[in-house]
């Protein structure tokens, strides 16, 4: 890690493809911005899709990975081993457009430090990564590369016609960038593959806040979902994509047999198409499991639907849940796990690699699966449902461990250290 010239840093610009909704990058960015605000910094945003304050945001549509031109390039650049000259031309046309607007963002908002959220980690928007890299290289601007996951962790990015661009920008080797990763395995891989040192800052949660309980607004959620008295609500707080392992949660519910359980998948996003959604819907039907995924009752915030009914947010779902399922095959860290322990809900979790290395050793009490559901997993879940004292002891212990190891206070300490690497003390 390198020291840049000493300078006053007061205005921080977050840069990513989107800052909207409840995906891990958007949620973690909000936490960083909150803590940096408490530390006295002003935060601004550059992205292609946003729900941040408009007066602090520069919105450039081509920065979003779902923009038609960007999505078309993705199809042409991966799953192949070479690219046409026309593709190169389109990449550089978009790169130049984005680069110009990034310079405008830095000037208009008088940015002192860039925090690049995953846009230099995973190539969802290749021109954008190139543009960010060139701006930092040309200005020597202090930057933090906050990496949530890397392209070498995803099968679909391993064959490409853009290896030269991946080497250049995902992530780049530039003296003014301090790299931050969210787990110890990512730190090791970044060192081995790129020769870059990095700081580990795990995902965090505001354990000093008060969790939302069942209130006058959300007490109707169960009835609106068609649940009866004595039914159990299992919450899978993830997107509908294959690595989230929703089929394991379906199997778990099926094996509980005698209990009436509704399995609710909270997120609407299907970033990797609809094939997996169709698969889990058919699987749930085959096993006669009551699955709700992509419900119009759920949104990013409370509100009213087209016909005047209530829209519930993720926190309403947590407040009403009896158990949280988290059977992911892979996670960069595990935001949903922290949310579940904050809301003091029992958790069934798969021992994905980062959980095994960075979270499990802390001593959380959960129902575990290791790649697949076992009789022991089912037995442990049954005990959580049937034994209130066991459930209370586990959830209270988990909350205290979360507060100790994954709090905003820890985030502030780590951010101060990273910012000091730019020669800034304070």
Kindly label every feature range from the protein language model.
Residues 7-9, 35, 44-113, 286, ...:
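A conserved catalytic-core segment of Leloir-type glycosyltransferases
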Residues 329:
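Aromatic "clamp/platform" in nucleotide-sugar-dependent glycosyltransferases that forms part
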